[in-house]
Amino acid sequence: MSDSQKRTRKGWILPASVASVALVASLAAGTLGAYTAQITNSGNSAGTGKLTMSESEIVDGQPTKTEDTSKGKNNTISVSDINKYGGNMKMVPGDSKTTTVQFKNTGSVDASAFTLNFGDCTVTGQDAGEQSLCDALLVTVTTGGTTLVDNQTPTALKDHQTFNIDAPMAVNATKDFDITVTLPEKITDTSIMGQQISQNLVWTLSA
């Protein structure tokens, strides 16, 4: 065999061996990834519900003067044009005034608690040593046949921490409250004449 022929045969041997190794590697790689199974969970999301409350005065069976906490900062509003104590500034012994208000869960989640708190009672027109109208008027609050507050003075109500109202309160559910203020007929102390009081009522819905 000539040197030329030897070189030619040797020249084919190496490429053939490299090709064989490449083929084996290819087969091995194909075997490792031959079967796969995959699940993609799409649309995974989360969010927050909304708890808001509206207040209305009920006049002739219809809600009026409606205000909603969604309009206020931090979901809180102050309502002054629905006078829970009736606004009668010329009461005499034996007079009574009832105001009906309605609260509605206007949010997207059920409320787990509903509470009522009374603020300080402030009086004007009182001279030193005179009886305060805060200690003379009587307040009653009823809802759904249940008496929440029974003939208590504004002063006593301020000292009561929290009145719990039946809950839960579902979305779009409403609760009506009758608030009655009475100046007892037995009042004979004329020092309360010409006095006016003011007291905040705070209604809180929680979830």
Task: Tell what function each PLM region has.
Residues S2-A207:
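Long, small/polar-residue-biased beta-strand-and-loop interaction regions
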